[in-house]
Amino acid sequence: MSAKPDLKIVLCSPRGFCAGVVRAIDTVERALDKYGAPVYVRHEIVHNKYVVDGLKKKGAIFVEELAEIPESTTAPVVFSAHGVPKSVPADAQSRNLFSLDATCPLVTKVHREAAIHFKRGREIFLIGHSHHPEVVGTLGQLPVGAVTLIETAEDAKTITPKDPNNLAFVTQTTLSIDDTAEIVALLKERFPNINGPHKEDICYATTNRQLAVKKVAPVVDALIVVGAPNSSNSQRLREVAEREGCPIAVLAQRAADLDWKRFENITSLGITAGASAPEVIVEEIMDAFAERFTLHVETVSAAEENEFFPLPRQVRPEAAAE
C-alpha cells in the first residue's frame, strides 16, 4: 500500500460560531428545556442545516410565517438571529403568541441607527443584499419608502436622493468588508455630508473571519469554507478567498459535499467556517482529508474573540424559577 501524500492544513482563526449565533441557538435550546416541545422558530434560527436539523430533533418546529403556527398554541415562538420586520412581533402580539427575540444585538444596533436617522428626517440608504432576511428585517423597521436599498457600487454611483445634504446610511452586518468600503467611499464622495454609523455596521465576526481568510488564501492551493449556500457571511468568505488569488475556493456544508477530484494535486489547504457553521463539521472535513492524506496542521490567527451576548431575559438561567 502506497504512503498517503502529505497535506498541510492551515486553519483560519477565528472561524465558526459568533456570539450572536451562540445566543440564538442557546435561546431555542433554553426554551425547549424550560417550556418543553414544541418551540416554534420563525425562519431558520441561523443559516445552517446541521444546526437546524439538530434543533428539529429536540422539538423545534421551523416556519417561515407566523400564520403557519396553530391559533390555539401556547408554545413559544422564537425570532431568528437575522431580525424581523416590526410587523412580525406586532402580529405575534395580536395573536397572543409568546415570543422570544433571538435577533443578534449587532443587527438590533442597525435597527436603532435607522430609527434615529428616520426620526431626524434623513433619507436612509441600506447597503445590503435584497431578499436576505436581515435586510428584510431592517427595511421593515420603518415605513415603506423610508429606506432605499443599495446593493452594488453601480447603485451608489447612480442613486438620486431627494436632498443630497440630508442623508444617512446603514449596512447589513454580514457583507464583504472590501465591497462595502468601496460603496461607502462612493457615497461619501458624492454626498460629503452623509451620516454613517459611529462604529461600522459590519460585525466583528464577519470582519475577523474575512481578515483570517485574507491571510491564508494567498498561501494555499485550495480553501474550504464550511457553510450553507444561503449563509451570506459564508458566501463572502469564499469570495474573499477567490479575490485573494486562491486557485480553488469552495463552500461545503458537509464532507460529503466535496468533489475530491478538485483536491487530488494539492499540497496545502486552508479551512475556515462561516459564523453559523459548527466546529464539528470542520472536524468532519479534516477527518475526511486524513483518510486520503497525511495531515500537517497549523493555525493562522487574525484576531482574538471573547464577545458574549446575554440571552433574552425570559430564558436566562436566573429566570428559571419564574
UniProtKB/Swiss-Prot annotation:
NCBIfam families: ispH_lytB, PRK01045.1-4
Sites where the protein binds (2E)-4-hydroxy-3-methylbut-2-enyl diphosphate: H47, H82, H132, T173, S231, S232, N233, S276
Active-site positions on this chain: E134
Keyword Iron-sulfur: yes
Gene name in the database record: ispH1
UniProt entry keywords in alphabetical sequence: 4Fe-4S, Iron, Iron-sulfur, Isoprene biosynthesis, Metal-binding, Oxidoreductase
Enzyme Commission number(s) from the entry: 1.17.7.4
Cofactor note: Binds 1 [4Fe-4S] cluster per subunit.
Gene3D superfamilies per UniProt: 3.40.50.11270, 4-hydroxy-3-methylbut-2-enyl diphosphate reductase, catalytic domain
PANTHER family listed in its UniProt record: 4-HYDROXY-3-METHYLBUT-2-ENYL DIPHOSPHATE REDUCTASE (PTHR30426:SF0)
Transmembrane segments: none
This protein's name: 4-hydroxy-3-methylbut-2-enyl diphosphate reductase 1
Origin superkingdom: Bacteria
GO BP terms: dimethylallyl diphosphate biosynthetic process; isopentenyl diphosphate biosynthetic process, methylerythritol 4-phosphate pathway; terpenoid biosynthetic process
UniProt-listed Pfam families: LYTB (PF02401)
GO molecular function, one term: metal ion binding
